[in-house]
A protein has these predicted regions:
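Low-acidity, Ser/Thr- and Arg-rich intrinsically disordered low-complexity segments
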Residues: 5, 10-11, 15-16, 22, ...
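Short Gly/Ser/Thr- and charged-rich N-terminal loops/segments
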Residues: 26-27, 46, 60
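Replace the tail clause
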Residues: 58-232
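Bacterial N-terminal signal peptides
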Residues: 44-57
Length: 232
């Protein structure tokens, strides 16, 4: 959830025991958005995913796979190289992805993961390899995938941004950014279907898209700029 308050952040990442040392962070200026209020918000929205979750997903598989040569092809990271076969049009971290988001005026879906992270593999398998989910993401977001081990500086930057927004900062890390790089919502692992009080990735995508459209000025005027590493 997004909360405007000071906080001290220190969190280990899974079994690797990697942690960010406790750091006093400035409060976020964005309004509070909890999972509960997100569900209320989603209840007022048109069912964006209805058409995607309808029958016919199997017919989409071959078409998406045939055009799934994304921007991770040729990456030196074996983790990103495997994701190059996914139907999502992933970009690596860099200016090209942010330039594309500005050109299309779309929010950015950013996924931070690692080869050794079991929940990263599970989220890939459950959600990112599903053709109907990939179609929705490709139609509404510009997507970036980051390898924790290959890009530790970027990983630390993303974790600091999540902490600034009082969001979970483990692995996988799921973040939603404005085209200019302002992080405005996110979390960690999200299941394909709601489970144990945790929203599904589909719900998070709908909510992030709605926030981007309805609170654009607030997002751009506050929060943590992941691209420039500046907290406002």
């Amino acid at each position: 959830m997004l909360l405007g308050r000071d906080m001290t952040f220190s969190r280990k990442i899974l079994s690797r025991g990697i942690a960010i040392k406790s750091t006093k962070l400035k409060p976020s200026k964005l309004p509070g958005v909890s999972f509960a209020s997100m569900r209320t918000l989603l209840g007022k929205l048109p069912p964006l995913l209805c058409a995607l979750l309808a029958t016919g997903a199997a017919a989409q598989v071959s078409a998406l796979r045939a055009t799934s040569s994304n921007h991770l092809n040729g990456s030196k990271s074996s983790y990103l190289q495997r994701a190059s076969q996914q139907p999502i049009d992933w970009y690596p971290w860099g200016e090209e992805a942010f330039r594309k988001a500005k050109e299309l005026d779309r929010p950015i879906l950013l996924d931070l993961g690692a080869e050794w992270c079991p929940y990263c593999a599970q989220m890939d398998r459950e959600s990112y390899e599903r053709p109907e989910m990939a179609k929705f993401i490709n139609d509404h977001f510009v997507s970036i995938k980051v390898d924790f081990d290959m890009q530790p500086e970027i990983a630390a930057r993303l974790q600091r941004a999540q902490a600034y927004m009082n969001l979970p900062a483990g692995l996988p890390l799921t973040a939603f950014l404005s085209p200019s790089g302002k992080l405005y919502f996110g979390g960690g692992y999200f299941p394909a279907e709601p489970r144990g009080g945790k929203p599904s990735l589909g719900e998070m995508l709908e909510g992030a898209l709605c926030l981007f459209r309805e609170q654009r000025k607030t997002i751009e005027s506050g929060g943590f700029d992941v691209w420039t590493q500046e907290g406002v």
